[in-house]
Amino acid sequence: MPTRAMPIRPLLAALLAAYGLPGMAAEPVTELGVVRVTAPRPDGRSLFTERVDAVRLPALRATTSDTASLLRELPGVTLYGAGGVSSLPAIHGLADERLRISVDGMDLYAACPNHMNPPLSYLDPNQVEAIDVWAGIAPVSTGGDSIGGTIQVRTAAPAFAAPGQGSLIKGEVGTFYRSNGDARGVNLATTYATETVSASYHGAYAKSDNYKAGGTFKTYDFTGRIGHTLGRDVVGSTAYEAANHALSLAWRAADRLVEMKYLHQEIPFQGYPNQRMDMTDNRSDKLNLDLTNRMGWGKLKARIYHEQVEHEMDFGPDKRYWYGPASGGPTATDGSPCSPIGPNCAAGMPMYTEVKTTGAKVEAEVARTDKDLVRVGGELNRYRLDDWWAPSGAGMWPNTFWNIRDGERDRAAIYGEWETRVSPAWLTLAGLRYERVSTNAGAVTGYIHATPPYSGSGGAGNQTTDAVAFNNADRSREFNNWDLSWVNKYTVSPTYDIELGLAHKERAPSLYELYAWSTWQMAALMNNFVGDGNGYVGNLNLKKERANTLSATFDWHAQDRDWGLKLTPYYTRVADYIDAVRCGAGMMGNCPGTPPNPSTNQFLRLIYANQSARIYGLDISGHMPLSETGLGAFGLKVVVGYTRGKNLDTGDGLYNIMPLNARLTLTQAYKGWDNALELVLVKGKDDVSKVRNEIETSGYGLVNLRLSHGWKQVRLDFGVENLFDRLYYLPTGGAYVGQGTTMTNPSLPNYPQWGTAVPGPGRNVYAALKLSF
């Protein structure tokens, strides 16, 4: 690799600024002249990484209030449909708790049997400064208790006044509007800082009504509520409202940075078109204390954090609220208000979840030589969950149903990794991690029991029978997870790099996979975090998932990166993959104590089960300039994704695997304008999970138009998505259960019925304006 001259002072300043210590970078440094350096070592943790950074974020923020959607242009990343601010990212077909997702270093988990509040939903897109994604081959310092990859989200780093400036005051205010759903919102950020102290606030508010599809996709109007109907192109239960607040305080010295962040969120409502319930309230508070200390031998980082979530669910305005014989019974398309609340009359179905998460991390980074770096660290995470359903009448009567009581999931991990430059062209990173995961849950009861906490028999759907069996079982579980990774980068030439990685990853089952105990159809339907309309039952005998992944990236590019092409093939084999098997055909049948339901066209009940799986595919991404004309500089960007997943025990397809898809973008830069014409192509989906009766979807193509202009202190974004108002169905959006009698699986002419996938949004005209000061 050729050498080049580099002044010491700018190099030192750049390195110190990169470590978040601008105070050191800004101090006077004695000029030592010029030295020659050879093959500067990049961060090995950047291998197999994709980043959404400050350059890409502004245009993405204008189109969405869902932070997970900021990842939609990355190769290998797709989204599971959920609420308007709560999509779940998937990497190569592995999603949710198969990924390790952190927000400012905090490991967070959903606090809901439907996973309505996944980690990325706790930030507004305007609060995000950068997102790093490791697909499958994550270093052990960033991985753990996951098999699919890692997503790390960072909010804005603290800003400080420059030497001699005295104080720094800055901020921004923004607003947006999106026509489809009448979505609107505002955001505000402000900072006051001296050379050593920084204080900042960031707030954001977003609200939307239901969005419309690109055409009629259903044959009914009723919602289950008297006097309330929805147009046949309106996607029910897609409205939302969310408010986010963040306060940050930071202090720095020459070699130390201490930062405290407080995050508060309130979501008074968020609908879910692929779930039986809606979020009727969600309040969360997070406190995060971080220390970074530069020392002569390297760097020491420590963090402690705490989160508390109070979550409520019930039937939103597009779903039936009144149940029981006095409301018209199960065949009524609209439930009538009734009283008194009791065996014949139910007012909704309130469900509550409370979660407390406390964590700590410490990591030491030791530079042994100018070619070798060692990282060692330890982590603790303590997760507590209670999930109960208050009595509301009819079948939900007369006692409280405990879905999970005194749920516990504790993680303790240690790891070490070694990064070294074997030669000027070869960088390698190898690591080993051990993690112990302990889970437990307390005794439960259903709505019906003779003598608390459990006794007797019967109850709707075998509630008491199931509760007795669960309570008499040993519920304590211990899992010993091992995580190994080895990644390499070889620079073949100035225009060609190869990355090669091997990884062994392990994940312990979640609390809901283990402890959702009731086989009752209604209760099982409420325990679903994949949005397929089915009901799920936990399994105390689940083993941990064990995945082996091989991946490579072939990267051709210009020396100045003006053009580039990346190909990333990957292969993953998972032992004890947590899939599902069918329960019996009868509503009251224990699971799996009766012959499985053979249906191919209805919603089902399933129980989690360990099986084996295989996932493979190819990611392609590239960019190139096309021409420079009087109308500006034109370029082309391409992202292609192909993933196949198979259950090796049954030969069935894996659930929610995105079919072949491509995103082609023609870009234009002209006199301050950055514009794009985007074509999104998705193949029809027929390789589905038959055990779940997953719904097939047709292929489609969408055209999006995006324009933006930046002035010194003003930025304007506007555009049109789904320009031709195409009706299409989301391949990973789940089953449509967004309106009607959603508590159960009703008979015709009532709805919801199996067979309709959630449609994507129709034409949407959007605009966003940001003013900086």
What are these model-derived regions, one by one?
Residues 108-137:
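Short acidic/polar hinge/loop motifs at secondary-structure boundaries
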Residues 277-296, 353-355, 403-411, 464-466, ...:
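Outer-membrane beta-barrel signature, preferentially recognizing the C-terminal barrel domain
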Residues 214, 507, 580, 683-687, ...:
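C-terminal beta-signal and adjacent terminal beta-strands/loops
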Residues 421-427, 436, 562-578, 583, ...:
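Gram-negative outer-membrane beta-barrel transporters
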Residues 159, 167-174, 178-185, 189-282, ...:
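Periplasmic-side early beta-strands and strand-to-turn transitions of outer-membrane beta-barrels
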Residues 242, 255-300, 308-340, 345-357, ...:
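Flexible loop and strand-edge segments within Gram-negative outer membrane beta-barrel domains
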Residues 33-68, 88, 96:
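N-terminal periplasmic "start-of-domain" segments of outer-membrane beta-barrel proteins
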Residues 215-235, 314-350, 388-402, 440-476, ...:
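Solvent-exposed loop segments that connect transmembrane elements
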